[in-house]
Amino acid sequence: MQKKFEDCVKTMLEIIGENPNREGLIKTPNRVFKAYEFLTSGYTQNVKEILNDALFESSNNEMVLVRDIEFYSLCEHHLLPFFGRAHVAYIPNKKVVGLSKIPRLVEVFARRLQIQEQLTEQIAQALMENADAKGVGVIIEARHMCVEMRGVQKANSTTTTSALRGIFLKNEKIREEFFSLINSAKQVRF
């Protein structure tokens, strides 16, 4: 499979008018293969395994928010990067998730070919289902190189998506608290 991938990269270089045998490009097919292997490693990771090993009994029934989770992903339409920050909150239902697992969850889905809307939904759904949470809220703010480098070429534009589940969808007060915590956090840095 690796050889087939590298041959495709070599062909692409030839099609755009490059010499894949010149010094600077000779190892490019292998480098691109390794990069894509890493950037799409989310396909080989199991969400249940990541979260189920880190669910802990707790009487906490208040919101848990992990904000400013930096991520990068590849747009499934152009294979160009998009990157930004995810804010993930949930309300526990007798169990809390190990805090490091929430960024890992974001990473699992970000390391796949994606669109931001789907990424947001997948994170929310996976946390809701696997943590048996009372509710989940996910907001992602990202910059897309397919928008900035090609097409409309609008540098520094940001796309924001949200996904709400359970009590976050049904209870306006909880939703407001979630949005307030995210917005107030932008003012304060440690």
From Swiss-Prot:
Pathway the protein contributes to: Cofactor biosynthesis; 7,8-dihydroneopterin triphosphate biosynthesis; 7,8-dihydroneopterin triphosphate from GTP: step 1/1
Binding site for Zn(2+): C75, H78, C146
UniProt catalytic activity: GTP + H2O = 7,8-dihydroneopterin 3'-triphosphate + formate + H(+)
Transmembrane regions listed in the UniProt entry: none
GO MF entry, a single one: GTP cyclohydrolase I activity
UniProt xrefs under Pfam families: GTP_cyclohydroI
GO BP term (any one): one-carbon metabolic process
Cross-referenced InterPro entries: GTP-CH-I_C/QueF, GTP-CH-I_N, GTP_CycHdrlase_I, GTP_CycHdrlase_I_CS, GTP_CycHdrlase_I_dom
Keyword terms, alphabetized: GTP-binding, Hydrolase, Metal-binding, Nucleotide-binding, One-carbon metabolism, Zinc
GO terms for cellular component: cytoplasm
PROSITE patterns xref list: GTP_CYCLOHYDROL_1_1 (PS00859)
Documented EC number(s): 3.5.4.16
Subunit comment: Toroid-shaped homodecamer, composed of two pentamers of five dimers.
Family matches, as NCBIfam families: folE, PRK09347.1-2, PRK09347.1-3
Family: Belongs to the GTP cyclohydrolase I family.
Protein name: GTP cyclohydrolase 1
Organism: Campylobacter jejuni subsp. doylei (strain ATCC BAA-1458 / RM4099 / 269.97)
Taxonomic lineage of the native organism: Bacteria, Pseudomonadati, Campylobacterota, Epsilonproteobacteria, Campylobacterales
